[in-house]
Amino acid sequence: MRWVLAGLTALLLWLQGLLWFGEGGLNDVRGLSRSVEAQREEVDRLRQRNQALEAEVNDLKTGLEALEERARSELGMIREGETFYQIIEREDDAR
C-alpha cells in the first residue's frame, strides 16, 4: 500500500511539474497571453493609423475641388489658359 501511495504521489508531482514547467504549461500560457496582448495593442494602433490614412486619402480624392476653389479665391491662382480679371473699386465708390 505504501508503494502505491508513493507511486501515486510521484506521479502527481511529475504531472504538476509538467503542468507548471513543461511545454504548453502555465509559464508558456502566460508568455503567450502577454504576446497576444501586445499583438492586439499593435493591431489597434495600426487600425487607428489605417483609419487616419483612409480619411486623408478620401479627403484628397474628394477634396480637390474644394482645394482648387480655396487656391483660386485666397491665393488668386488660375488654370493654364485662363485669364484673371481683378476689379478694383475706387475709394469714392466704396463709400
UniProtKB/Swiss-Prot annotation:
PANTHER family reported in the protein's UniProt record: CELL DIVISION PROTEIN FTSB
Source organism per UniProt: Alkalilimnicola ehrlichii (strain ATCC BAA-1101 / DSM 17681 / MLHE-1)
Ranges that cross the membrane: 4-21
Cellular component per GO, a single term: plasma membrane
A GO BP entry: FtsZ-dependent cytokinesis
Alphabetized Pfam families for the sequence: DivIC (PF04977)
Coiled-coil positions: 26-76
Protein name per UniProt: Cell division protein FtsB
UniProt record similarity statement: Belongs to the FtsB family.
Keyword Transmembrane helix: yes
Gene (UniProt): ftsB
